[in-house]
């Protein structure tokens, strides 16, 4: 997702310091505007955007996998890093800047065929991953750092990959401390087709 890619650039440029995020976000918007939402990954246009961002000293490894020819396919981590419906999601105790990442999760068999879909929360430790992409393992490979469910909707004649492509995700978080967050994302805005991933 273009917006998610921009947020990864912000984390990287902030070196994990949340207090720098707003100023960097404003600079990104000044330079990029909404230009990433219509850019097809791996296209000549994407290469042009890359060159412009390199000149502005705004290019990032995150943008490379977001709009470059090769996607990042991250298979998450060890089995204990994912939990099911109703379980508490784990946050590494060193993280002070983190957020949920609601996503569509594809259920894929051993032959690489997509057989269904479910919901997922891929917890993002922005302060850890933002310091260095080489810390992705520390940021992602933690007990209960992702949640999936409540069930896998198997594909059949009534539900398939086109339904996934049209899906709208909504997330509402209400913290015990009064914090509230409501967000949504549309699979129609994804930078790459789910089957390409």
Give the ranges of each region predicted by the language model.
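Active-site microenvironments in enzyme catalytic cores
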Residues: 1-163, 167-172
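A beta-strand-loop signature enriched in Asp, Gly, Thr, and Trp
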Residues: 155-197
């Amino acid at each position: 997702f273009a917006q998610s890619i921009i947020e990864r650039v912000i984390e990287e440029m902030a070196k994990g310091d949340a207090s720098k995020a707003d100023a960097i976000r404003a600079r990104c918007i000044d330079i990029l505007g909404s230009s990433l939402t219509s850019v097809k990954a791996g296209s000549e246009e994407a290469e042009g955007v890359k060159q412009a961002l390199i000149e502005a000293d705004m290019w990032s490894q995150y943008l490379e996998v977001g709009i470059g020819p090769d996607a990042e396919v991250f298979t998450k981590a060890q089995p204990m890093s994912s939990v099911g419906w109703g379980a508490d999601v784990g946050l590494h105790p060193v993280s002070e800047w983190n957020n949920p990442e609601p996503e569509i999760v594809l259920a894929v068999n051993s032959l690489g065929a997509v057989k269904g879909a479910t919901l997922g929360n891929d917890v993002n430790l922005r302060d850890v991953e933002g310091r260095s992409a080489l810390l992705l393992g520390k940021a992602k490979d933690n007990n209960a750092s992702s949640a999936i469910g409540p069930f896998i909707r198997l594909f059949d004649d009534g539900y398939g990959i086109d339904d996934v492509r049209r899906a709208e995700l909504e997330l509402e978080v209400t913290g015990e401390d009064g914090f509230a967050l409501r967000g949504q994302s549309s699979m129609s805005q994804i930078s790459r087709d789910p089957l390409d991933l």
